Amino acid sequence: MTQQIGVVGLAVMGKNLAWNIESRGYSVSVYNRSRQKTDEMVKESPGREIYPTYSLEEFVESLEKPRKILLMVKAGPATDATIDGLLPLLDDDDILIDGGNTNYQDTIRRNKALAESSINFIGMGVSGGEIGALTGPSLMPGGQKDAYNKVSDILDAIAAKAQDGASCVTYIGPNGAGHYVKMVHNGIEYADMQLIAESYAMMKDLLGMSHKEISQTFKEWNAGELESYLIEITGDIFNKLDDDNEALVEKILDTAGQKGTGKWTSINALELGVPLTIITESVFARFISSIKEERVTASKSLKGPKAHFEGDKKTFLEKIRKALYMSKICSYAQGFAQMRKASEDNEWNLKLGELAMIWREGCIIRAQFLQKIKDAYDNNENLQNLLLDPYFKNIVMEYQDALREVVATSVYNGVPTPGFSASINYYDSYRSEDLPANLIQAQRDYFGAHTYERKDREGIFHTQWVEE
């Protein structure tokens, strides 16, 4: 008997996705390069329609045609090697789905190469971590549309379900569109986390709040417009005590790791010529956190103000909340503007409102306000920037004073807030009819004869700035 779908790669994500698929009524063949992992999964799957195979030949032969194969192997050369091993065994119109954390440019390359061999290739972003993989992730598949249609029932079944019952999966677009959207999703995640961390820094270092007070504050914020998975878990984190009955989070070394997708997002923004300042500052913040020894040394010799607050703490705490929400809006505005530009350049025809909808459950950035983003694009599918939508425009105009005060207070007290600072600078730059770039262009013309345009007349101009 042949199975309906196969999974290659049985690390925690592949294993959990295989179990998720099987739990929805599909029979699953599994294969792993290491026989041990396959045997372990079989032992952990009594009574389930999980069928082990121990060679790629056996694996491919075990699948019904057209074959549907989900690759959950390490991104990069390992994915290429797995595809190279499978390719001679496949038939025309078989479907490979790469669910790894893959660079979208690799997906474009693989999609093109496999199409020349009459093999369909779907690059699919998977968000939600190991728990989401098992119970329902947010899925972002891109590739051939007809191939997606052949696997859409399975993907719809395993995806997370929003409160209205909709599955958190949709066809994203051709070739690398799915992995591209997942990349930007991860970049937005970096910014969300950094902005929350800066809020915590203000609470702790400026307002002198205890871990219990901080936990309660985040729990209260999660009951309002900031409701989201990351705010929810932050409240939980500050409640967790260690063996000494002290806040565990305060014992964790302050060096933040990363897998590189935030950096990819920032690099792509530079290539597109799109301002992505908040996400990029969040990436840099992780970089500077990683040079712990340098910071310890610098802290002993580079002096600055000592944080001191004399105002009403409750009032200022509300300003931090508003600053966080406005900065979050600015970050998403930048991320969605980046996806809009990439969609135009690559002819992907991304449905930006639909992207917000599939992030409502299953993924790390799930949040209440994603519905507001969907509403914004429903009202105007050609919306240039989320800040121009009536709802978001009203919020940022109302909350800007709070963000300005939070940034000014943080600077005056020496509390670093690169994400908040980038947010208000982006807002002010975006709303400026005139920026001092005219001087930069004059300088470029002065030293390099790069020419310039004028406001008052048509044409391209060059000036001899100093008479010989």
Curated annotation (Swiss-Prot):
Biochemical pathway: Carbohydrate degradation; pentose phosphate pathway; D-ribulose 5-phosphate from D-glucose 6-phosphate (oxidative stage): step 3/3
Class of this enzyme: oxidoreductase
Coiled-coil features, chain-numbered ranges: none
Keywords, alphabetical: Gluconate utilization, NADP, Oxidoreductase, Pentose shunt
Catalytic activity: 6-phospho-D-gluconate + NADP(+) = D-ribulose 5-phosphate + CO2 + NADPH
Residues that bind NADP(+): G9, L10, A11, V12, M13, G14, N32, R33, S34, V73, K74, A75, N101
The keyword Electron transport belongs to this UniProt entry's keyword annotation: no
EC number(s) recorded for this UniProt protein: 1.1.1.44
Binding site for substrate: N101, S127, G128, G129, H185, N186, Y190, K259, R286, R444, H450
NADP among keywords: yes
Gene3D superfamilies: 6-Phosphogluconate Dehydrogenase, domain 3 (1.20.5.320), N-(1-d-carboxylethyl)-l-norvaline Dehydrogenase, domain 2 (1.10.1040.10), NAD(P)-binding Rossmann-like Domain (3.40.50.720)
InterPro entries found in the cross-reference section: 6-PGluconate_DH-like_C_sf, 6PGD_dom2, 6PGDH_C, 6PGDH_Gnd/GntZ, 6PGDH_NADP-bd, 6PGdom_BS, NAD(P)-bd_dom_sf, Pgluconate_DH
Subunit structure: Homodimer.
Role, per record: Catalyzes the oxidative decarboxylation of 6-phosphogluconate to ribulose 5-phosphate and CO(2), with concomitant reduction of NADP to NADPH.
Protein name as annotated: 6-phosphogluconate dehydrogenase, decarboxylating
Organism: Staphylococcus epidermidis (strain ATCC 35984 / DSM 28319 / BCRC 17069 / CCUG 31568 / BM 3577 / RP62A)
